[in-house]
Amino acid sequence: MDDDGLLINFEVGEGPIKPQIKFTGGRWRERNRLQRSVKRGLTGSQSNDAVADDVGPAPAKRQRLSEGAAPEIQRRFRPQAQGPRSQHVSSRLFTSNPTPVTNFDEPETAPAEEPAEPALPSNAPLSDEAATFAALGLSRRIAQHLSAKLELKAPTAIQHRAVPHLVTTDEDAFLQAQTGSGKTLAYLLPIVNRILALNQNEDGTISKDASKKIHRNSGLLAIVLAPTRELCKQIATVLEKLLRCAPWIVSTTVIGGESKHSEKARIRKGINILIATPGRLKDHLDNTKVLDVSLARWLILDEGDRMMEMGFMDDLKEIVSKMREAPLKKINPDGIQLEPALPTRRVTVLCSATLDHAQVRRLGEYSLEADKTELIKVDGTEAAKEGDEASEAVFAAPSQLKQSYLVVPAKLRLVTLIALLKSSFARRGSVMKAIIFISCADSVDFHFDLLRSPIKEPKEAAAPPTPKKAPKDAGETPDTPPKETKPTKPVTNHTESTVGKACYITSAANTTITLHKLHGSLAQPVRTATLDSFSKSKDPSILITTDISSRGLDVPAVDLVIEYDPAFAVADHVHRIGRTARAGRPGKAVLFLQPGSEEGYVGLLQKNASTALTPQLYDSVLQAGFSSNIDLPPVTATNEDGQDTEQQKQLDSRKQTWTSRAEALQLHLEQRLLASDASSQASNNSGKGFNSKKGASTKLGKPAPKSSDGATGTLLASGRQAFRSHIRAYATHVRDERVYFDMTQLHLGHMAKAFGLREAPGGIGAGVQRRTVKPSAANGGGKKSTKGDDGDGLDKQDDDEAERTRRMKKMMRMVGAGASEFNIG
């Protein structure tokens, strides 16, 4: 017994001891508020496993403190009040993630039948010996040019079906075939062949009589309309190569973003084939008197269904009505009889990889004649010709295209994307070019800046002033003072803000990977230069883009397409994955989906897919991508010479697993965003906002150069803006697909992790600032563009803003405002 003669034993369980905190002093209201906040914090910590684990088991016996114990020891065991939470809290990547619905172990998730041999390409040229261009009814001059100069030995299935019909008849036609099957040549070859026939003698030779020869002043004979500027440029390139066998036939383009004065000058000189976007063509028909369509025999609507979706229906109606108002002339100004070589009526051709019955009916109401319309459809290896009914199903992708989908939680999206790119470019020559489709322009800008190396490259052209040329006259000596010369204009680099070297995804095999970005808010010269750089790049390259690049673009050697954000409609998905596996080449397409309701989206895609979509979990991609070291760039520009000690520990992979590497990479990305904001505030206190006009700084702590879209700001501000735009874009799926992309099931905090943010920013429904393109040298001119100058699109500013605006108007009740940054083209 003790000295007082009483001993009481209390049994205390092994559970954690709840700290009892009592506040003294101050006002009663303040003490009560603190007491309630601490109580809420303790309750939340008990429900959180990660925090509950930090509270150890109760000790076997309470430690006794003597009366003379040091104050430091007494304070150590005294319960302390819980302080304010840290401003930046980083959650773990592999905890609290939703469970996928797909069972990856079931054999039903795999393709039903594994073919013993690879699938034969469905959009490749025909191998039949009889299938030659000469057998299609084309002239010998064109057939020889295709085989000798363009190296095209045989036509594709759609060309084999469409060219004879358009050469011999004057009927309207629908051309429906898989992506990459040669639909452009399917309508260009008949046009050039029939125009060329005006210059031919009866024996097929070219007439030498100048009075019977077609030239640029013979009149406009064909008009080709396309929804985007990039597609118009591509069609013009194909037509230019084709017309090398007939250089007297002249073509040109009129598109938004270019100088209307220059376009009018080209039209005034004379053209035979015009390639245009609907808005700009309507503008010229209203204001350019020299543009005469009375001789036009063809109206081609390339991706016509897309033009209607983008809101060009009113423009198309006015174009068709103006062409019908002009009486069709049979003799051109030179007195050449156009018939019967050319059609006796205006022929309208609609071509696309996706056509449904509703769109055909809507377009046919005002542009086609029902009794003179032919549907020419090629489905895979089987060619079918149907007259009255159009299939309502979305057209299938090429059979040689390998499709798969990744089930990735929201928190792991960013690191999984980097791991997929790193593993895809791990071997030299494995993937030369890849395209990443993202939903909105702000997200494209952010991911480009994040994956772009922060280390500035030395300028190649940093040479001293150009030396003076040697004197040409014999009497001159080096001591003779040089003659005054006019200062040369500096060469504008349009790709300075859209092309750069990639980081995180390089390997020993591919030490240099070029990164590109493309969206509709960029100026037209920048868009053209960026696409040209990506197409002609000989190094491994990646293009981060919106849906502006999903239709019609034919970029060589694209082996991988990544849909980082799912398409807004199934038809858009078909066109996205159609950027690879073109003209018989193999290709691979990967779709990112989140666990839960989004997994049901696969069933919708599988209905009309020619091949099965293979499911894949994110862990296999992370293991393949993070099996080796990750080259982390410096967080700030002040640390370019070497990494921090903490990052050096992260790079030591001898004891690291793929999970720890993924978490280290995510932590590095978050620190990089925070460092960009901190360095910006330290360099200039006035440049705090994303849209600050003065004093804005980059993630490297240096003054931020104005990008092609006129925006400046830190990487952290860019990530927040990209997050807001992504959430708004998530709500714009078509009605039939919203059951799979449910806003109520989207975890905003986890999604913020995919943008390198540690918490979800607010202001999602408060509207966005409209992008403005300021006149600069990088934008291709000094004149300020107005709505009337562009003439392309609903607001005559961007040809791709119309569709996003239309869809966002439907969602204004949910998100609160329209969004102009969703430029998908």
From Swiss-Prot:
It is found in: Nucleus, Nucleolus. Its EC number is 3.6.4.13. SUPFAM superfamilies: P-loop containing nucleoside triphosphate hydrolases. It comes from the Eukaryota. PROSITE patterns: HELICASE_ATP_BIND_1, HELICASE_CTER, Q_MOTIF. Its main location: nucleus. A motif (DEAD box) lies at residues 302-305. It catalyses: ATP + H2O = ADP + phosphate + H(+). A motif (Q motif) lies at residues 131-160. ATP binds at residues 177-184. InterPro entries: DEAD/DEAH_box_helicase_dom, Helicase_ATP-bd, Helicase_C-like, P-loop_NTPase, SPB4-like_CTE. It is an enzyme of class 3 (hydrolase). CDD domains: DEADc_DDX31, SF2_C_DEAD. Residues 21-125, 457-495, 632-657, 676-713, 764-825 are annotated as: Disordered. This is ATP-dependent RNA helicase DBP7. It comes from Pyricularia oryzae (strain 70-15 / ATCC MYA-4617 / FGSC 8958) (Rice blast fungus). The lineage of its organism: Eukaryota, Fungi, Dikarya, Ascomycota, Pezizomycotina. The gene is DBP7.
